[in-house]
Amino acid sequence: MPGTLDHFRADEYSPYHFFSSEEWAKFRADTPLTLSADEVKRLRSLDDPIDLDEVRRIYLSLSRLLSSHVEASQLLFEQRNRFLNMGDVNKTPFVIGIAGSVAVGKSTTARILKELLARWPSSPKVDLITTDGFLYPNEVLRRENLMERKGFPESYDIGALLRFLSAIKAGQPNVKAPRYSHLTYDVLPNEFTVIDQPDILIFEGINVLQSRDLPAGGRIVPIVSDFFDFSIYIDADEDFIHNWYVNRFMNLRQTAFRDPNSFFNRYASISEEAALSIAEGLWQNINLKNLRQNIVPTRPRADLILRKGENHLIDTVALRKL
């Protein structure tokens, strides 16, 4: 099927090493489990069944791998400083990009990794930013007739996003990232998260691995992933993601949508049949199109692919060869 991990041939000439979840779990070695069941429950998103067993199977090995990349980056930084005779300068943050479809579990992965990586001695300060804050405000999207394209590449203020990442990788202190409200479904005016020289910055969003056409005139323009030191893609079959998205929408009708301030409050009081029809329409007309056109094509650019089965748990890991 197009859009599945089988697109990559698991042979000696594949750009990836492939591991089952059981094989991957062995790379944990003696990495201690530092999260409790209550912490995992707090960190996971609605309808995401991740538990301590999944953290043991997948995320401890992943945090160990990422920590070794961070330590290697720090060692290279020190060696380069000696080579350049630069003296005492601060290392810029190690940036991890996390991409994948809506409802696939990017946010849970990002939050779990943030907690685990912050407990490694090489990276005590870990921050997390999502691309949601870099969406254009709804007022702009309506004016440009882009509300039905929200989440597509053109709905983001790419200039602001690139300026943010450029400042982070330049080592600037107190870099501001705009904040987003999932309640109001809009960017919060004049509200920011301040990122102050962390050891690691996790940058999560559906299209963070997207490339772009070369501009006319040959002018060099960076892309978001140019600023990443490591990238992760969360993968699953279309049918699974479809079911997760619709189930999440229906469950939100009983929770967040009931808030009078919710952008989606109108869906809380309609019939279940009508709500299901709306969820299916949103999936078919917006999210599935974005997945096929803009998200899945970025998957081969990831350093690591975490592939989920129908139960929302990871069953295969693909790690790019060095």
From Swiss-Prot:
It comes from the Bacteria. It catalyses: (R)-pantothenate + ATP = (R)-4'-phosphopantothenate + ADP + H(+). Pathway: Cofactor biosynthesis; coenzyme A biosynthesis; CoA from (R)-pantothenate: step 1/5. Keywords: ATP-binding, Coenzyme A biosynthesis, Cytoplasm, Kinase, Nucleotide-binding, Transferase. GO terms for molecular function: ATP binding; pantothenate kinase activity. Gene3D superfamilies: P-loop containing nucleotide triphosphate hydrolases (3.40.50.300). Its EC number is 2.7.1.33. It is found in: Cytoplasm. One of its GO terms (biological process) is coenzyme A biosynthetic process. Coiled coil: none annotated. Pfam families: PRK. SUPFAM superfamilies: P-loop containing nucleoside triphosphate hydrolases. ATP binds at residues 100-107. One of its GO terms (cellular component) is cytoplasm. HAMAP family: Pantothen_kinase_1 (MF_00215). Belongs to the prokaryotic pantothenate kinase family. This is Pantothenate kinase. It comes from Agrobacterium fabrum (strain C58 / ATCC 33970).
